[in-house]
Amino acid sequence: MSTLVMGVVNVTPDSFSDGGMWFTTGAAVAHGLDLLEQGADILDVGGESTRPGADRPIKEEELHRVIPVIRELSRAGARVSVDTMRASVAAQAVEAGASIVNDVSGGLADPDMAGVVADAAVPFVVMHWRGHSDLMQDHASYGNVVVEVCQALSERASDLCARGVNQEQLILDPGFGFAKLPEHNWSLLAHLDALQALGFPVLVGTSRKSFLGTVGLSPGQRPRPPAQRDVGTAATTVIAALAGVWGVRVHDVASSVDALRVVAAVEAAG
């Protein structure tokens, strides 16, 4: 199975990488269509920034941001995912045409999410989560990050299945950058096989994360800004593809699509 590319469509004023760039419906739809042209398999539409320290919009504002975009992109033939922690937003997004729910809290932020996903019978991305963005970095402490993340995701999957979600719906995400220090992110990236061994599809979302902006820098140097982390992101796309993951979630689709073509060419030659 080829690794899928999920292109990010942030309809937010404050996302860490591109906040405000696609904040109107028209701009977000145009950006999504451009990502499809670049080779995206899925478009992940979100109306809430999950960068460390971000404030949450109210539900009505989140709906106002994402539903028109999802509706238009779905009408254009795109396979759309909704990036939300709110069950009510997920339900309306599915009605508008979304065919995947991507919840960075894995259903922990809203107790109604499991029921919505079970009723909708759509794929559900379950991320490793230790709290909302304003406090999550306070919980970036692990004895063995790989073991603990795998255990937490396995337990989360079991709980969701007990609440009516079909096991076949679940996709696991280790949550790069969420309650993780750089060393935790590198360790997870080096041990994707452990996540794969859980028996679920895996989504990798390293795109433009801060740990990629520190590679090769001397102590005290400022990390490279998000827009200068796409080469590093493409490198992690190669690592993820070689590990056999289900998908990668990226901002710059073209570079990751090219990286996957290189992987495919090497595998075909072997």
Can you describe what each PLM-predicted range is?
Residues 1-5:
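Extreme N-terminal starter segment of soluble prokaryotic enzymes
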Residues 166-169:
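Short acidic capping loops at alpha-helix termini that bridge into adjacent secondary structure
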Residues 176:
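Acidic helix/loop microenvironments that form the catalytic cleft of cell-wall polysaccharide enzymes
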Residues 17-31, 50-72, 79, 85-88, ...:
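Active-site-adjacent loop and "lid" segments of alpha/beta metabolic enzymes
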Residues 13:
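Catalytic-pocket segment enriched in acidic/His residues
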Residues 30-46, 242-243:
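Catalytic domains of carbohydrate-active enzymes, especially glycoside hydrolases
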